[in-house]
Amino acid sequence: MLEKLKTSLINSPVIKRGEYNYFIHPISDGVPSIDPHMVEEIAEYILQITDIKKVDTILTIEAMGIPVANALSLKTGIPLTIVRKRPYFLEGEVELSQRTGYSKGALYINGLKKGDRVIIVDDVISTGGTLIALVKALKTIGVEIQDVISVIGRGTGYLQLKELGVEPKILVTIDVSEKGVEIKNVFGNE
């Protein structure tokens, strides 16, 4: 179960960004190259743990959620919408502010309306800042969130999503130290 993902996480290099232990991984960074078989493994697993028939749109955040979300879109035929980092000034565009552990900025939602049913697919949840801002914005629009799935989780940022009434599914939960990446949990093995 998610063997390619787990093995690649364990083998991920860790670098220091200030006091922060940052792991470098194809799913979260695109470095080294993204193994298409690993992406397929992840997409297949997501299809096992979510009711995709209740979804109108697969939603992801630019940039690193795109490979997995695109694989899901191709497998299901469900359209993919990408929350972008720049505005397009289209009618109905919604701007949201997000803050992560190491960055902040604006994101822009286009093409969603009240009553749309989405699954949110993201690469990593750590502080939860991006997903919290996105969930709040979607609720304001009136979009129905069917599921929130993060391929990788570290830290406790997901707890704030629970306070918003969203129970994220984190495929692989990790700890990161100077020594490397340690697998703490795989969704479904609780």
UniProtKB/Swiss-Prot annotation:
Record InterPro entries: HGPRTase-like, PRibTrfase_dom, PRTase-like, Pur/Pyrimidine_PRTase
The keyword Cytoplasm is assigned to this record: yes
Keywords of the record: Cytoplasm, Glycosyltransferase, Purine salvage, Transferase
Gene Ontology biological-process annotations: IMP salvage; purine ribonucleoside salvage
Keyword Glycosyltransferase found: yes
Pathway(s) of this molecule: Purine metabolism; IMP biosynthesis via salvage pathway; IMP from hypoxanthine: step 1/1
SUPFAM superfamilies documented for this protein: PRTase-like
Entry's Gene Ontology molecular function annotations: guanine phosphoribosyltransferase activity; hypoxanthine phosphoribosyltransferase activity
Reactions the enzyme catalyzes: IMP + diphosphate = hypoxanthine + 5-phospho-alpha-D-ribose 1-diphosphate; GMP + diphosphate = guanine + 5-phospho-alpha-D-ribose 1-diphosphate
Class of enzymatic activity (EC top level): transferase
Enzyme Commission identifier(s): 2.4.2.8
Entry's Gene Ontology cellular component terms: cytoplasm
Location in or out of the cell: Cytoplasm
Signal peptide boundaries: none
Principal subcellular localization: cytoplasm
Cited Pfam families: Pribosyltran
Reported function: Catalyzes a salvage reaction resulting in the formation of IMP that is energically less costly than de novo synthesis.
Subunit architecture: Homodimer.
Family: Belongs to the purine/pyrimidine phosphoribosyltransferase family. Archaeal HPRT subfamily.
NCBIfam families, alphabetized: HPT_Archaea, PRK02304.1-4
Protein name: Hypoxanthine/guanine phosphoribosyltransferase
Organism: Methanosarcina barkeri (strain Fusaro / DSM 804)
